[in-house]
Amino acid sequence: TFTIDTVDDVYAEGDEVFRVSVSGIVDSDSNPIFEALNLDNAFVDTTISDETDPGPEDTVTVTMTGPANVVEGDTTTDYTVTLSDPAPVGSIVTLAYSYTTASGDDITETTQAIIGADGVTATFTIDTVDDVYAEGDEVFRVSVSGIVDGDSNPIFEALDVSNAFVDTTISDETDPGPEDTVTVTMTGPANVVEGDTTTDYTVTLSDPAPVGSIVTLAYSYTTASGDDITETTQAIIGADGVTATFTIDTVDDVYAEGDEVFRVSVSGIVDGDSNPIFEALDVSNAFVDTTISDETDPGPEDTVTVTMTGPANVVEGDITTEYTVTLSDPAPVGSIVTLAYSYTTASGDDITETTQAIIGVDGVTATFTIDTVDDVYAEGDEVFRVSVSGIVDGDSNPIFEALNLDNAFVDTTI
C-alpha cells in the first residue's frame, strides 16, 4: 500500500486526472522478482479537485499602484497591477470603475490589462476626456475585478484584491484652451416702444449646460439709463440645455428722451450656488443693443401737469411779486420754463416781458417776476396774461413728452 501527496497550489485548474501504475516488482538491487508480469489492471486513475472553500494558501494577493492625479484631457501615467504568484503570460486583468465626483463621461475606461513576460505584472493607462465643464477636482477609482484567461475562466482559485485599486483625481487645466471654451451668442429685438415689454431675447450655447442653469445678465447704457428699464438679471437654461429666453420691461416715463440705447449682455453661466458651469466662455457675441423709442402719441401717463400761481394785481411802475410755476414731475435742475404773454386791455408796452424762468434745485418749481412800465398815460386797469409755453433744456429740446398747461397761467391787472 502507498499514498500520494497532492500539491495545494493557487491555480483554478478544475478537475485534474493522473494515473499511477505498476511498472515492475524488484528486489532491493532492482532485480526482477518474477519472470513475467500481467499489468493490465495494475493502475488507478485519480482526479484532483480544487477545494470547495479555498483558504489563504490558495489565495493570490493583487495590488495596484498608479497616479494620484491627472490633468483633464491628458493620458495618465502607468498603473501597475502586481500578483503575488505568477499567472500565464498573456492572462487578462479585468478592471472595474467607480466614481465619486467624477463620472463615466470624464474618462475612457480601460477595461483590461495583460500580464507580461514576468507573469506577475500588468500595466495600463487611462485617457481622460477634455470637456468644457468647470467641474473642479473629480475623483474616480479603478480596481481589479479578476484575473482570467482568454475564455474568461479564472486563473486563480481566490484573489485578495483589498489593495488592488487606485483613486485618481482629474483636475481642470490651469489655462483653458479653445477646446475648453463654450461660445455664447445672443439675439433679440433692436427696438422697443417705451412702456412696452420687449420681445424675446435668446441666449444660445455651443455646448449643453444642465437644465436649470442660470445665465447672468449685465447692462450698459449709451443714451439710455438704468431708470429706463427694469433690468432682468438672469435667464434659465431650458430643457434643451442650450437656450434661455427672457424679456425686459421698459419704463414709461414722462420725459422726451428721443431714442435711448441700452446693451444687455451675458456675464456668466452658473449653477444655483453661483459656481461656473463651464471652464471658459466666449461672450464676444453674447449681447444685443436695443433702442427705446418714445410713443408716437403720448398718453395721460406721459403728460406732466404744469400750474402757475402769481399776483392778481400790480401797481404801474412796480415789480410784481413772484409767479411760481409748479410741475407734477421733476425736470433736471436748470431746465428752462418758456413764457408767453397775451393782452386784453394792457399791451406789450406796459410791461417788460420776462421770457423764461429756471427750474430750481427741487426740480419742480421755478419763480420769476415781471417789471411794469410807469408811463404818463391814464389807462385805467390794464390786464395781461402770462402763461407757460414749454419746458426745455439749454438747446431748446423739450424735457417732457407732453404737457398739460390748462392751469399754467395767471391774469394780472396793472
Placement of each model-derived feature along the sequence:
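Short boundary segments that mark the start of a structured unit
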Residues: 1-414
